[in-house]
From Swiss-Prot:
Coiled coil: 95-139
Record flagged with keyword Membrane: yes
Keyword Methyltransferase: no
Family to which this protein belongs: Belongs to the CBP4 family.
Origin: domain of life: Eukaryota
InterPro entries, per the entry: Cbp4
Name assigned to this protein: Assembly factor CBP4
A GO-annotated cellular component: mitochondrial inner membrane
Lipid bilayer topology: Single-pass membrane protein
One GO BP annotation of this record: mitochondrial respiratory chain complex III assembly
Known function: Essential for the assembly of ubiquinol-cytochrome c reductase. It has a direct effect on the correct occurrence of the Rieske protein, core 4, core 5 and apocytochrome b.
Chain intervals for the UniProt region annotation (Disordered): 124-143
Subcellular location: Mitochondrion inner membrane
Length: 143
């Protein structure tokens, strides 16, 4: 028996709603919140995130100030003003970012070298103590 056309359309809409609803529910319950994501980070990354939070907030405030200033002016929208265009890769911002990354990498290397030096010094001290202990127990003559 042939079903009426409205029944077919009702079925199409019901199935479509079910698929979209399932997708929304999956997204809602499987996507972690910001707090859960930060809590899942390793301690080093969490520390770095906390250190750089104020820097990101300051950047955002500066960007909002520039946007308000640009919106209040009579210049055309495509004139970016103090904001550098993302297509201009030869600008100062790319160089400063590279320099910042280089300085940060050097700092991490220095800290790692300092840690290795301290660890090596403790190993040397332990080895010297152990050698001294063995030497004090043994003598040159077996009798």
């Amino acid at each position: 028996m042939e079903r009426p056309v409205w029944f077919r359309w009702l079925r199409v809409y019901a199935i479509g709603f079910g698929i979209i609803g399932a997708g929304v529910l999956l997204f809602k319950y499987t996507t972690p919140t910001d707090e859960e994501l930060i809590a899942a980070l390793s301690p080093e990354l969490r520390q770095q995130y906390e250190r750089e939070r104020k820097l990101r907030q300051a950047e955002q405030q500066e960007l909002m100030r520039i946007v308000k200033q640009t919106a209040a002016s009579e210049t055309p929208v495509w004139n970016t003003g103090p904001i550098k265009s993302p297509w201009e890769r030869k600008g100062v911002s790319a160089e400063s970012r590279e320099q910042f990354q280089q300085v940060k990498a050097e700092q991490v290397q220095r800290e790692e070298l300092q840690r290795i030096r301290e660890e090596l010094e403790t190993i040397r001290q332990q080895s010297a103590n152990k050698t001294q202990e063995i030497a004090s127990k043994k003598s040159w003559w077996p009798w």
